Regions:
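Recognition helix of helix-turn-helix DNA-binding domains
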Residues: 200-233
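Helix-to-coil/beta transition segments that act as allosteric "coupling" elements at the rims
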Residues: 108-133
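Regulatory sensory and allosteric helical modules in signal-transduction proteins
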Residues: 64-116
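GAF sensory/regulatory domain recognition
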Residues: 48-72
Length: 248
């Protein structure tokens, strides 16, 4: 393989150090390319199904695949039938693509064309779950032989369970940097902060010396301003935007 196994530890540590220094949206694509080259992979794909401040209908997708394959994949709506994406949205554990059911006609067509377009002979995916509902899937592919893949995939499983989350953190930093500032009142900030610490509306009201209905009003207006679907989501967005900090 391109990467000698005795260099894996160096590759891992160097990659972690680099990812921690990046924060711009353009850095995500650059980071994936560097990881691909450093680990001797065929391709890398990152799909964020849910991010603070971003609608489920507007997923973030960053890949190293060819432009032709990406265009075909979306033109033919292959994501709807992609068993890797489907499993990645409910699974908590990493999985090898060989574990995915490929019995369906549409699925066999998808994977057949993927190989033709150079996606890679083997693949592995790493589901990502954030503290406040953010959800993503990080995938790697390889063109190694079956024998070589069975030898190295355990090492990749070890490294990429961590690297996937570092890439996700980079995405969160990049997304935060591009979001327009949201202005919350001091009371809205206070209520959100205490909600983030697990307090109920009644408990927050007692802490702040205001009515429970007033507390709920502040939480609702904060949720609306942040474009959140609920208070938990509002807390996540407020943290990502550095509006609040959850510490006692």
């Amino acid at each position: 393989m391109t990467l000698f196994l005795d260099k894996l530890d160096d590759a891992f540590l160097d990659t972690v150090d680099e990812l921690r220094t990046l924060s711009a949206s353009d850095d995500v694509q650059v980071a994936l390319k560097r990881i691909k080259e450093r680990y001797g992979l065929k391709h890398i794909a990152y799909l964020a199904h849910s991010l603070p401040g971003r609608s489920h209908k507007d997923p973030l997708i960053v890949v190293t695949y060819s432009t032709d394959w990406v265009k075909r994949y979306f033109d033919l709506h292959y994501m709807r039938n992609d068993p890797v994406v489907a499993r990645g949205l409910w699974s908590l554990m990493p999985f090898d693509w060989s574990e995915v059911d490929l019995s369906g006609v549409q699925v066999r067509r998808l994977f057949g064309e993927a190989r033709e377009y150079g996606v890679g002979r083997h693949g592995m995916s790493f589901p990502i779950r954030g503290q406040y509902g953010d959800q993503a899937l990080f995938s790697i592919t390889s063109d190694e032989t079956d024998t070589e893949w069975s030898r190295i995939r355990r090492l990749f499983m070890r490294d990429f369970q961590v690297l996937a989350y570092h890439v996700h953190q980079l995405v969160l930093r990049a997304e935060t940097a591009e979001v327009s500032p949201v202005k919350l009142s001091p009371r809205e900030v206070d209520c959100l902060r205490w909600a983030g610490l697990g307090k109920t509306a009644a408990e927050i009201a007692q802490i702040l010396g205001i009515g429970t209905r007033t507390t709920r009003f502040y939480l609702e207006t904060a949720r609306y301003k942040l474009g959140a679907i609920n208070v938990t989501n509002a807390v996540a967005k407020a943290i990502s935007l550095n509006i609040i900090s959850i510490s006692v």
